[in-house]
Amino acid sequence: TNCFPNTLDTTVHFRKGKDGKPDTFVYTGDIHAMWLRDSGAQVWPYVQLANSDPELKTMLAGVINRQFKCINIDPYANAFNDGPKGGEWMSDLTDMKPELHERKWEIDSLCYPLRLAYQYWKTTGDASIFDEEWIQAITNILRTFKEQQRKDGVGPYKFQRKTERALDTVTNDGLGNPVKPVGLIVSTFRPSDDATT
């Protein structure tokens, strides 16, 4: 019974953004970074209660707003900092930015924000989350999915890390294993953050 309030007390950080919209940063466990998939899963149980608690509803809208802002910073990233702080993975051989905690391309990182936004809208009827930021994020998601079908080459994403763990880096000069472009979307990393093989 304590996990519902504990999650809100220890991992959810709500504020109003510079644009006046709700902005909720959700820490993933003990790491002060926000994984797109994990943050969506962490707040998922609260969606069913959104209509009975206006503050909870606003917090959820803030998570969705933040997720789509993150996607617009980099749709290939899986985890983000709370601002341009840099971090331990800045030396990864990929297009790192100071807003990124980690840049491991995982298809679920783009699917979970869509799932959360849809369920929030379906439950609350609140369409305010579907604004210009959302339109840009959807455009970036669709572009990324198309790029990673790899019908027109390997796409812009590459990733390499100096590590002793084989599944923490990507083979083939950071492009991953060759694939036959049949229309499926290549996900370079699994939800576990391990490279696909």
List PLM regions with ranges:
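Aromatic-rich carbohydrate-recognition surfaces in CAZymes
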Residues: 32-60, 64-168
